[in-house]
Amino acid sequence: DRGIYVIIDWHTHGAQYNVGAAKDFFGRMAQKYGHYDNVIFEIYNEPLQVPWGEVKGYAEQVIPIIRSHSDNLIVVGTPTWSQDVDKAANNPINAHNIAYTLHFYAGTHGQYLRDKGNYAMSKGLALFATEWGTVNANGDGGVNYGGTEEWLNWMDQNKISWCNWSIHDKNEGASIFNPGGSLSESGKYLKDILHGSAPYAPWR
């Protein structure tokens, strides 16, 4: 009723080594929760230096398990910390209601990564930024306001859904809470973005 979605995520860097466990997990999750239309399945959060062919092969084994219970959106990670959506675009998965993961951190990643996204979309792929941060790719550092603005505008223009990293009180820049629970610099900024009050929120 409140427009909230839930992502059931296999949060790993090596899902291709645990296909059996992933099939069992997503089979049970899809059977139990797949009838809710606000549930999304992310079957491989962030492959590292894994060839796209291996990621695709893993996905082609897990997707049918979910589809036996649910037609909901399935999100598939891409190589190199879920950045190489261009490689997925050249050899996409033959399945319906699939999106591909694009991860970025505004302090590290810029136009070259958006160019990969533009290429993937030009080939017909749907993208979902299931992890992005306002800081550097190591999860730390100060908020890069200019870089975040560029990414927010690009995602808004291309109707790309996103999830910010992270709801955590770890002592690092990406956490939206400081240790102890007060909002961090990134947390304050994200709150302003979500409320549409930040000057960098394209939907304000």
Region roles according to the model:
Residues 2-5, 19, 23-40, 44-170, ...:
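Extracellular glycoside hydrolase catalytic/binding regions
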